[in-house]
């Protein structure tokens, strides 16, 4: 007999979760730790037990028995027998292969003799094997540590790396108890938990992996806490120059590090010190006309004896940096991100080269504890003007989205929303520059996009923080690692197709906790029954998984409600 529980687990690994069930929220919080959200229409959300989601759960300490027990406790029907077997087989593969370091040799150990034979005979593994070390072990070439882990995860045997790390040159760093502005400072409880999960008491079981925390939850501070524990010279990789300088400001504000110890390596400066902060862009730069293999700034990885490398917004790590990271497996590596989702599907490379997920905290849990602002999400659907419909329907697939996303009917809505929030600091976010230029002119508001000089960006961000600017129009350059704590309203007029990570990052711009505990409001404007609406639903997946709900409005209903409110 069926029980009144929210989940139905199918034999193909699909989990159907009923939203209106009283136990939906607790089931969602449990399931999201070991399954991926696939789609989220109004009443039934669909999850899937993926191999990588189960391996990440295993790396966080979950056992197959715990996952089966959690699923069973929320499942309306008994779990299919093949799913029980799948969970056990998948999770039990984590740790079958291990890398260790013994007597000056890198050793690959495999606890299953048949899998070991498969590895021995693999054409991909053969170039990396020095010689056999025993029935269950191989000596691996020293430079192949990262490549071997990449190969093994593709073969279906994620490798637990216990080979240890180069300590790096020492760094005398400690976190401050009072900031430079005289404010008290300490790590929050969950920040300590994240730091300690990564460090694992300094053992070989720690020292590499990814910390997943919402935007606004202080991932930079977690990174600084790890730096203090490691106590070694550190290279920090960030998304852009603005983020780079925010890292430097935070380090100088909240630690004993001085300006001569923290250096910027960017297009403007090429300085290297005990702590050096750079960008993915500068590392992936190569001169036109040179070999695709030549990246002149890769030598930064050898300029110092780094004991720790921090990858900020690790979900954005570009392919060339993956390549150099494969050679850096003897260095401790910390990835920081709000979401492990990568639109290029290379989550397994993050797992094998940076490390598995070490800590994850649901967004709604931190919201309930007032560490991040509560947020209300709205999707407002607008119609096409008649003169745009033919252009849309005869366009190619890519142009269809651009035409729908830049629908001019969105402009009066943007203005109406801003009038609705007269006291708030507001970000207008979009993908298409001509659309943003029109909105900036309409609102008489400043705009930041890719061509805006870094000095101008920083000046405008600072004026926004100080309240001199109330509305700021920004392109995707502001998606990541921009600290605008007073921003409380975001209006998204267009996005990068169906990018789930972008939606999460854009909401994150307004999640910094507010002085009086005020909530944040996120609007996304979409053209009804078009690619714009279709991609919007894909973008919302990650946030839906985190517990956010979108109120759906018809544009005229939204405007009428606002008019009625003004007439009262």
Regions found by a protein language model. Give the residues of each.
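Conserved SF2 helicase motif VI
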Residues: 340, 497-519
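Conserved interdomain hinge at the start of the Helicase C-terminal
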Residues: 394-431, 437-438
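Conserved helicase ATPase core of P-loop NTP-dependent helicases/translocases
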Residues: 262-264, 427, 434-438, 444-479
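Post-DEXD/H (motif II) to motif III coupling segment of the RecA-like Helicase ATP-binding lobe
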Residues: 308, 315-378, 543
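Extended alpha-helical interface modules used as scaffolds for assembling large macromolecular complexes
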Residues: 1-175
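Conserved helix-turn-beta segment of the N-terminal RecA-like "Helicase ATP-binding" lobe
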Residues: 242-268
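Conserved segment of the helicase C-terminal RecA-like domain
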Residues: 509-539
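Walker A/P-loop
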Residues: 203-226
């Amino acid at each position: 007999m069926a029980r009144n529980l929210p989940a139905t687990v199918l034999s193909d690994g699909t989990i159907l979760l009923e939203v209106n069930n009283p136990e939906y929220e607790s089931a969602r919080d449990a399931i999201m730790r070991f399954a991926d959200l696939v789609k989220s229409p109004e009443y039934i959300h669909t999850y899937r037990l993926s191999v990588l989601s189960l391996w990440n759960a295993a790396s966080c300490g979950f056992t197959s028995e715990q996952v089966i027990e959690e699923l069973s406790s929320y499942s309306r029907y008994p779990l299919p027998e093949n799913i029980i077997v799948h969970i056990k087989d998948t999770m039990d593969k984590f740790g079958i292969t291990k890398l260790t370091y013994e007597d000056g040799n890198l050793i690959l150990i495999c606890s299953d003799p048949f899998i070991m034979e498969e590895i021995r005979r693999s054409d991909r593994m053969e170039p990396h094997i020095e010689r056999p070390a025993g029935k269950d072990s191989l000596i691996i070439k020293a430079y192949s540590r990262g490549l071997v882990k990449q190969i093994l995860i593709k073969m279906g045997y994620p490798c637990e790396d216990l080979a240890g790390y180069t300590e790096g040159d020492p760094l005398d760093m400690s976190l401050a108890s009072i900031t430079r502005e005289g404010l008290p400072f300490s790590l929050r409880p969950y920040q300590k938990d994240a730091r300690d999960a990564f460090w694992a008491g300094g053992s070989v079981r720690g020292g590499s992996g990814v910390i997943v925390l919402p935007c606004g939850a202080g991932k930079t501070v977690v990174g600084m806490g790890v730096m203090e524990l490691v106590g070694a010279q550190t290279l920090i990789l960030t998304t852009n120059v603005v983020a780079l300088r925010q890292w430097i400001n935070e380090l100088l504000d909240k630690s004993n590090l001085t300006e001569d110890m923290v250096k910027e390596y960017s297009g403007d400066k090429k300085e290297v010190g005990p702590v050096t902060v750079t960008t993915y862009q500068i590392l992936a730069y190569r001169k036109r006309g040179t070999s695709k293999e030549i990246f002149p700034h890769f030598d930064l990885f050898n300029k110092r004896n780094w004991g720790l490398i921090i990858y900020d917004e690790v979900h954005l790590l570009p392919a060339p940096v993956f390549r150099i990271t494969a050679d850096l497996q003897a260095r401790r590596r910390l990835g920081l991100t709000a979401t492990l989702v990568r639109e290029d599907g290379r989550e397994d490379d993050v797992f094998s080269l940076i490390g598995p997920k070490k800590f994850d905290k649901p967004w709604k849990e931190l919201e309930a504890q007032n560490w991040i602002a509560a947020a209300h999400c709205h999707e407002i659907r607008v119609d096409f003007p008649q003169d745009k419909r033919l252009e849309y329907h005869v366009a190619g697939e890519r142009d269809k989205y651009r035409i729908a996303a830049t629908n001019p009917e969105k402009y009066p809505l943007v203005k109406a929303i801003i009038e609705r929030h007269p006291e708030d600091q507001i970000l207008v976010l979009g993908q298409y520059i001509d659309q943003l230029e029109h909105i900036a002119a309409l609102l008489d508001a400043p705009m930041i996009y890719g061509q805006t000089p870094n000095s101008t960006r920083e000046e405008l961000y600072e004026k926004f923080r100080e309240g001199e600017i109330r509305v700021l129009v920004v392109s995707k350059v502001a998606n990541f690692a921009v600290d605008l704590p007073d921003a409380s309203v975001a209006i998204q007029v267009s996005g990068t197709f169906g990018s789930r990570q972008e939606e999460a990052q854009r909401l994150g711009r307004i999640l910094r906790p507010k002085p009086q505990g005020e909530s944040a409001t996120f609007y996304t404007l979409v053209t009804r029954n078009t690619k714009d609406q279709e991609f919007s639903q894909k973008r919302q997946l990650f946030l839906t998984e985190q517990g956010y709900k979108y109120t759906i409005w018809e544009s005229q209903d939204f405007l009428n409600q606002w008019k009625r409110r003004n007439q009262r």
